[in-house]
């Protein structure tokens, strides 16, 4: 018999709140966390707004923030969300569990990015006569101005490694950075690890911020970001005819998942059961979905098949809903291909309309939102939905939360 996996702990750090209750209340109220970028001077960029987390201080969330002082923002967001999730699961204060069977699987963004130091090093190593970078001098500058710990913090594995060390989690430890799918994939792979008996418990989810000059300029070059000229809170408009790109957000979502009998034995509170997972690739283009939605269709259908539930049992779809022309059209097509006529009877919404796109952390935060929607019977809306798109013709819960049993 296949092992059943449940969620026993959850935590978030988002632009709409740094607790689950605060975040969800803001979502169902239709509030926006999007505003002018304050992290750096973005006035010369095509996009000047994002969904930032304001006044974040890790010391407010963990007992001892000193081990994190040299860590990047991705690790610090993850630590705060993980602290909440582990506390929610009753696993702090020397809880008696087998730590060798308790792992970490994240979809977390790149390690620390020391842009100011890097730019100054490039400037000092630039040879004006040859108009080129002196690589030997650049390496020498690195030896002067970097230390070993700072170098290690740039690696992709640092966030799960830090969480394992800080919370003494000695089981399997992985990070996958598969762009927007990262934390969803991490949760699915953590689920599979428990199913296969490699662990009994996993701390899983994601953490990411790309609200920095290279992140904004990079997505601007891809023409992926909204360049809306009005009120920034109106800029992200998933499934609307006039959508023009996504808005960067940042944050972390963390969950504790464990085998059902293990959770029952220790008297854990159970939030929900994870029943289905599937992972596919479009095999089309790195930056675009397949125009016929092949990967999306296969993934949705595969997850439903793996779960053993019927389409009629599904009461809500939390969409990726990025507010780009291609994604929203292809995602709608994928839902209709899998759900058939049922697609028009199943509410769909995108919380990216309010908190932007958390990139690697998006899936984890949106899963937690789904759990809260099921618990409360209230579905968050898709805000800024004004002009219907003939190709996006489902029920997107426009502009106002809805009471609905999901």
PLM features per residue range, with description:
Residues 78-91, 156-167, 173-208, 247-268, ...:
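Active-site-proximal alpha-helical scaffold in enzymes
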Residues 127-147, 188, 192, 208-265, ...:
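Glycine-/small-residue-rich "gating" segment that lines the acyl/pantetheine channel
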Residues 4-8, 31, 35, 230-307, ...:
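Condensing-enzyme catalytic core mediating Claisen C-C bond formation in acyl metabolism
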Residues 42-55, 115, 209-236, 278-298, ...:
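Active-site-adjacent elements of ketosynthase-type condensing enzymes
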Residues 78-89, 159, 258-259, 292-308, ...:
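Short, well-ordered amphipathic alpha-helical segments that serve as non-catalytic structural scaffolds
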Residues 21-28, 113-131, 193-196, 216-229, ...:
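A glycine- and small-aliphatic-rich helix-loop capping segment at beta-alpha/alpha-beta transitions
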Residues 85-98, 263-267, 300-316, 338-342:
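Phosphate/pyrophosphate-binding loops at sites that engage ATP/ADP/AMP, CoA/4′-phosphopantetheine
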Residues 7, 22, 31-174, 207-216, ...:
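Conserved beta-ketoacyl condensing-enzyme motif
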């Amino acid at each position: 018999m296949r092992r059943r996996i449940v969620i026993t702990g959850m935590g978030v750090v988002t632009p709409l709140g740094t607790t689950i209750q605060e975040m969800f209340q803001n979502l169902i109220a239709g509030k926006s966390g999007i505003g002018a970028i304050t992290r750096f001077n973005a006035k010369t960029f095509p996009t000047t707004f994002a969904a930032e987390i304001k006044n974040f201080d890790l010391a407010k969330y963990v007992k001892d923030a000193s081990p994190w002082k040299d860590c990047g923002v991705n690790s610090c967001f993850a630590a705060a969300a993980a602290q909440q999730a582990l506390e929610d699961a009753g696993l702090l204060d020397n809880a008696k569990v087998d730590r060798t069977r308790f792992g970490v699987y994240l979809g977390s963004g790149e390690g620390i990015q020391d842009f100011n130091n890097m730019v100054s090093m490039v400037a000092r190593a630039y040879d004006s006569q040859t108009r080129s970078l002196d690589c030997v001098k650049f390496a020498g500058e690195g030896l002067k101005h970097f230390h070993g710990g700072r170098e290690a913090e740039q690696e992709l594995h640092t966030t799960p490694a830090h969480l394992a060390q800080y919370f003494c989690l000695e089981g399997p430890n992985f990070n996958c950075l598969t762009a927007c799918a990262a934390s969803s994939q991490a949760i699915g792979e953590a689920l599979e690890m428990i199913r296969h008996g490699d662990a009994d418990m996993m701390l899983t989810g994601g953490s990411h911020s790309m609200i920095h000059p290279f992140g904004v300029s990079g997505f601007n070059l891809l023409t992926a970001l909204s360049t809306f000229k009005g009120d920034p809170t109106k800029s992200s408009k998933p499934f609307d005819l006039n959508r023009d790109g996504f808005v960067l957000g940042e944050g972390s979502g963390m969950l504790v998942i464990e085998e059902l009998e293990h959770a029952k034995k220790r008297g854990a509170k159970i939030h929900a059961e994870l029943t289905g997972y599937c992972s596919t690739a479009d095999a089309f283009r790195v930056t675009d979905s397949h125009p016929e939605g092949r990967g999306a269709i296969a993934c949705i259908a595969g997850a439903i098949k793996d779960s053993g539930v019927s389409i009629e049992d599904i009461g809500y779809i939390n969409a990726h809903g990025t507010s780009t022309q291609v994604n929203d059209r292809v995602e709608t097509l994928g839902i209709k291909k899998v759900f058939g006529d049922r697609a028009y009877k199943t509410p769909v919404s995108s919380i990216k309309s309010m908190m932007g796109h958390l990139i690697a952390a998006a899936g984890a935060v949106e899963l937690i939102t789904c759990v809260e929607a099921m618990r409360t019977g209230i579905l968050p809306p898709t805000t800024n939905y004004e002009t219907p798109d003939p190709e996006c013709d489902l029920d997107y819960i426009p502009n106002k939360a809805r009471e609905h049993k999901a």
